[in-house]
Amino acid sequence: MTDSYKLPDNPGDPDATDDEGIHPDEVENLIEEAERTQGGSEDDDLLTTEPDPVVDAREDDRDPTLEEDLEGDLQAVLDDIDAELGVADTPEATGDLPTTEAQLAERTEDLQRVTAEYANYRRRTERERAGIIDTAKSGVVSKLLPILDDLDLAEQHGDLEEGPLKAFADKFRNTLTGLKVEAFGVPGDTFDPEIHEAVQDLSEGDTKVLGTVLRKGYRFNDKLIRNAMVIIADPEK
């Protein structure tokens, strides 16, 4: 081959390239222009983006009664709290007021009844206690009556006119009198079979009196502890 391709001395010279070649400075300009064009289109896409139909559909599908249900649940919780705290301003609580007043009246009546029963119990207990004490005292007095009988016999024989025995008899009788021990049975008193024990009846008429008192009778606190032993006779004319 006689023809051969000869490489230029400066291959990068624009004159050595073909007509369609691009100058290096033009390459940089083309790159910058492409970047501007791409960036502007992306911003325009963002600005012109239409609403997402899926999101709109979710917003349209919300239950319109959801807020009402939540408010109802919240009110129920508040009502429970009011009930625990004893707040009674609802019509139902106000309607229970007559029932509460009736219960209060019933409890008051029960308290009054129990109070009256307790007062009666105390009075009954005090009476029983006093009765037991009187019974014990009357038992002691009954054992002292023979001493009184001996003092009466000594007085009939004139042994209590003076001396230490008379002083003892006076103190002993005064002590029993202070204990509400009372002697009865004096000649001339009307005969009473309830308190007098007759060993002989010398009367001839319907009216009977005590002729001779063989042994005096005694009462303690108006309670008979021993009958008087007597002989019945007619009243003196």
Swiss-Prot record:
Q: Name one GO biological process term.
A: protein folding
Q: Where is the composition biased (Basic and acidic residues)?
A: 55-65
User: What superkingdom does the record give?
Assistant: Bacteria
> What InterPro entries does the database record attribute to this sequence?
GrpE, GrpE_coiled_coil, GrpE_head
A Pfam family annotated for this UniProt entry? GrpE
Q: Which SUPFAM superfamilies match?
A: Coiled-coil domain of nucleotide exchange factor GrpE, Head domain of nucleotide exchange factor GrpE
Keywords, comma-separated and alphabetical: Chaperone, Cytoplasm, Stress response
Could you tell me which residues belong to the region Disordered? 1-65
Q: How does it assemble?
A: Homodimer.
The molecule here is called Protein GrpE
